């Protein structure tokens, strides 16, 4: 038996494969194939567009897949959300679908767009957004390059953004947030009733979450006399309580902890000033909480 897993093809593909590698699973792809292999003989992968992932997972064509919550909501299909994975194509953060208009337009809020044309890939969510506000608009599906459509081809757009740089580059101004979205590991409801598949999905979630948690963090080891331990611990903003282990010399202990990588620059000199020795900073692959 194998777990059939969907990998998002397109903008999320590179970031997803890199995340899998950090989690310990290498995904081998080919430019001429929509299938992929992994180092785990019990997992077979298909490259599927994120927009279609929920469809194939809900049908059982795939047991699980990675996609955005936006596309799950847009599809309206029943799948099980297993894990929220805090990464996107450019960063460790989530994304937003926003309502944007030309910088020099008079529109300041959604209600100002009554009777206007809205271009978007997220048609169903956008329809519900305007319907909830009682604003009649004409929503047109956009096949991409949505940012270039106002003002000639559309009066406004609903588009996804991470940093807002693409919108600014196209002289667009955000007037509202339609919905936030995050990357999700989703699964077929029936597949999660199968012991083998459920365990594979849960283990996959555990390892991916661990790889994400390790990003931007480093491990720190040091030795310190018991008499200086309190001062050394006061320097450490630990993820949890630091691990303290006795050394052969009963007057000394070893301290092991996790810190933000950017904090190491200031913390290590302060530890040295607190009489810590043998300070070692090391990279992390996974942090399983």
From Swiss-Prot:
Enzyme Commission number: 2.4.2.17
Cofactor(s), by name: Mg(2+)
Pfam hit, one: HisG
Gene3D superfamilies reported for this sequence: 3.30.70.120, Periplasmic binding protein-like II
Pathway where it operates: Amino-acid biosynthesis; L-histidine biosynthesis; L-histidine from 5-phospho-alpha-D-ribose 1-diphosphate: step 1/9
CDD domains: PBP2_HisGL3 (cd13593)
Enzyme class, first EC level, given as a word: transferase
GO cellular component terms, semicolon-separated: cytoplasm
Notes on activation and inhibition: Feedback inhibited by histidine.
GO annotation, biological process: L-histidine biosynthetic process
UniProt-recorded Gene Ontology molecular function terms: ATP binding; ATP phosphoribosyltransferase activity; magnesium ion binding
Catalytic reactions of this protein: 1-(5-phospho-beta-D-ribosyl)-ATP + diphosphate = 5-phospho-alpha-D-ribose 1-diphosphate + ATP
Family that this chain belongs to: Belongs to the ATP phosphoribosyltransferase family. Long subfamily.
The protein's name in its UniProt record: ATP phosphoribosyltransferase
Biological source species: Koribacter versatilis (strain Ellin345)
């Amino acid at each position: 038996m194998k777990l059939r897993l969907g990998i998002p093809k397109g903008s999320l593909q590179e970031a997803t494969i890199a995340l899998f590698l950090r989690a310990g699973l290498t995904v081998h792809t080919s430019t001429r194939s929509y299938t992929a292999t992994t180092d785990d003989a019990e997992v077979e992968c298909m490259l599927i567009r994120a927009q279609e992932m929920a469809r194939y997972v809900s049908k059982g064509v795939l047991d699980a897949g990675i996609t955005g919550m936006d596309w799950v909501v847009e599809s309206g299909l029943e799948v099980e959300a297993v894990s929220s994975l805090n990464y996107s194509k450019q960063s460790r953060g989530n994304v937003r679908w926003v309502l944007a208009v030309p910088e020099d337009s008079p529109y300041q809020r959604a209600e100002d767009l009554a009777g206007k044309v809205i271009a978007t890939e997220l048609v169903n969510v956008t329809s519900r957004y305007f319907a909830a506000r009682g604003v009649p608009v004409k929503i047109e599906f956009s096949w991409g390059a949505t940012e270039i459509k106002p003002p000639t081809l559309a009066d406004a757009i609903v588009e996804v953004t991470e940093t807002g740089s693409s919108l600014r580059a196209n002289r667009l101004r955000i007037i509202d947030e339609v919905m936030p979205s995050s990357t999700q590991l989703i699964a077929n409801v029936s597949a999660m009733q199968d012991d083998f598949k459920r365990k594979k999905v849960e283990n996959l979630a555990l390892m991916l979450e661990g790889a994400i948690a390790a990003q931007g963090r480093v491990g720190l080891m040091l030795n310190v006399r018991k008499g200086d331990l309190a001062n050394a611990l006061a320097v450490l903003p630990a993820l949890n309580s630091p691990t303290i282990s006795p050394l052969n010399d009963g007057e000394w202990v070893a301290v092991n902890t996790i810190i933000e990588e950017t904090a190491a620059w200031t913390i290590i000199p302060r530890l040295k000033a607190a009489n810590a020795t043998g300070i070692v900073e090391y990279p992390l692959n996974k942090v399983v909480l």
